[in-house]
Regions:
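Non-catalytic cap/lid and distal C-terminal segments of serine-dependent acyl enzymes
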Residues: 1-213
C-alpha cells in the first residue's frame, strides 16, 4: 500500500537524499488485490484492470509529480523519474521502466518477480504478455528505439537468495540483458538476505547514490 513507505520507514531511509534536494518521493497505491494477488479472479478482467492502473501512473501520476516538483519544491523541471519498488512493487517498477523508458529514466527494484505467471498462472493473452518482462524482453527486437534508452539509463534489479526470496526470474532477466547488451545492474545478494524491509533499507542506501549520480 502507498503508506508502507512511511509506516515501514523507507521514507526515513531516503531522508538524506530528500532533505538535500536530490530526491522527491511519490508513493502510489496499487490495485494488487484486484489484479496480481486475486489469483481466483477472472484473469481476463484482472490484467485489463492492471493495465488501467499502469496508464493511471503514466498519464496522471507522473504529470502530477512534475507539477508538484515545481509547486512544492520550486524545481524548474524534474531531472528524471525513477520507478522504485520492493516485492510486488519491484515487479511493477521494472515493468513500468521497461515499457516506458521514455518516461522513466531509471529503476530500482528490490525482490520482485518478473514473469506474469506469478499472478496469472497459465492464462496468457496479449496484455498478459505485455506485462511479463521475462517474456517480452526475451523477444525484444534489437532495432527497437527503446534499446538506446535502456543502454544510456541506470536501472538496478536486486534480489536476495535467503528466506522468502524468489530469485529465479531475476536470474532470467540477468541472462536476457547480458545477451542483448543492456547494462541493467542485476545483483543477487547472499543466501542470508531475506525478503524483508531490513534488507531493503540496506539495498536502497547502497544503490541510491549510483542511481542519482
Amino acid at each position: 500500500r502507498f503508506f508502507d513507505f512511511e509506516d515501514f520507514h523507507m521514507a526515513d531511509t531516503l531522508a538524506p537524499w530528500i532533505e538535500s534536494g536530490q530526491l522527491m518521493v511519490m508513493s502510489i497505491d496499487t490495485l494488487d488485490k484486484e489484479t496480481w494477488s486475486d489469483t481466483n479472479g477472472d484473469p481476463y478482467w484482472r490484467i485489463r484492470r492492471y493495465e488501467q492502473w499502469l496508464h493511471y501512473i503514466v498519464d496522471e501520476a507522473v504529470p502530477k509529480l512534475r507539477y508538484l516538483s515545481k509547486e512544492r519544491n520550486g524545481w524548474d523541471d524534474l531531472p528524471g523519474v525513477i520507478a522504485f519498488g520492493c516485492s510486488l512493487g519491484a515487479t511493477h517498477a521494472v515493468n513500468l521502466y521497461l515499457r516506458w523508458p521514455d518516461i522513466f529514466c531509471g529503476c530500482l527494484a528490490l525482490s520482485g518477480i518478473y514473469t506474469a505467471h506469478y499472478g496469472f498462472g497459465d492464462y496468457m493473452d496479449e496484455l498478459v504478455y505485455m506485462n511479463s518482462p521475462v517474456d517480452y524482453m526475451r523477444n525484444f527486437p534489437e532495432d527497437h528505439p527503446y534499446m538506446e534508452l535502456y543502454r544510456n539509463q541506470k536501472a538496478v534489479i536486486c534480489c536476495g537468495q535467503g528466506a522468502w526470496e524468489q530469485p529465479d526470474t531475476t536470474w532470467m532477466l540477468k541472462r536476457i540483458f547480458e545477451a542483448k547488451n543492456i547494462p541493467v545492474w542485476v545483483d543477487l545478494w547472499g543466501h542470508d538476505v531475506k525478503h524483508d524491509w531490513d534488507w531493503w533499507y540496506k539495498q536502497a542506501v547502497y544503490y541510491m547514490p549510483y542511481i542519482l549520480e
